[in-house]
A protein has these predicted regions:
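Conserved ABC transporter NBD signature motif
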Residues: 57-71
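Helix-to-loop junction immediately C-terminal to a conserved catalytic motif
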Residues: 49
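Catalytic Walker B motif of ABC-type/P-loop ATPase nucleotide-binding domains
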Residues: 151-154
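H-loop/switch region of ABC-family ATPase nucleotide-binding domains
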Residues: 186-187
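Conserved ABC ATPase "signature" region
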Residues: 107-122
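Conserved ABC ATPase signature
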Residues: 126-130, 134
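H-loop (His-switch) and adjacent beta-strand-loop-beta switch element
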Residues: 198-212
Length: 218
């Protein structure tokens, strides 16, 4: 999926968070979004997802202006925190995948995705028994059930141990190699072995956008 952000400005009350942000991605690109806490990373993602109404500027997905027409059918999103579930209540991986619109996929398609992401064997596990890395993979599977052309990941490795961080980025690299455009927010770009094609650095609401060689995070 192609992504184009043009002259995006956004703020809360009297504070401007994003100032005249512009960048463009082609299908299959892999963007790292970096910046300090409060720099506007999550705000930018919420604008792209249509959660924040954009007062100034333009965002288009595959050349469709989402500020005028919502075009999120093929957009997957993995949040940093999964607040929609009460983890004190017993719920299994399968039950998470069966709720809401994601239950529309067939059983065979679901099993294929679980196997692809490497968590087929835990499909009947209670989520309280999962590691941080396993839980992240569960929600990647859920996002892939939407058959996304764009996958947005918000700080996906927070609280995940080093080995699972490496495994996670290997999975993301493989998804990107299949042609999925990926936007990934990270607070520590050096921890990843992700094969980024572009980097967007946010500071005080302003952005520096650049192309980087595959796998070069410097």
């Amino acid at each position: 999926m192609r992504v184009a952000v043009s002259n995006l400005t956004f703020g809360y009350d009297y504070r401007t968070v994003l100032k005249d942000i512009s960048f463009r991605l082609n299908s299959g690109d892999f963007l790292a979004i970096i910046g300090n806490n409060g720099s506007g990373k999550s705000t930018l993602v919420k604008c792209i997802l249509g959660i924040n109404k954009v007062p100034s500027g333009r965002i288009s997905l595959d050349d469709i202006d989402i500020t005028e027409y919502h075009n999120f059918k093929n957009v997957g999103y993995v949040p940093q925190k999964f607040d929609e579930f009460n983890y004190e209540f017993p719920i299994t991986v399968n039950e998470i995948l069966q709720v809401s619109k994601y239950s529309k996929v067939t059983e065979d398609e679901k099993l294929e995705l679980l196997d692809k992401i490497g968590i087929l064997e835990i499909q009947n596990e209670n989520i309280n028994n999962l590691s941080g890395g396993q839980l992240q993979r569960v929600f990647i599977v859920r996002s892939l059930m939407n058959n996304p052309k764009l996958l947005i990941l918000d700080e996906p490795t927070v609280g995940v141990d080093a080995q699972n961080v490496e495994n996670f980025y290997q999975t993301v690299n493989e998804l990107n190699a299949e042609g999925i455009t990926i936007m990934l927010i990270t607070h520590n770009i050096r921890e990843s072995n992700a094969k980024f094609t572009h980097m967007l650095s946010l500071h005080n609401g302003e952005a520096l956008f650049k192309e980087v060689p595959r796998g070069d995070e410097e």
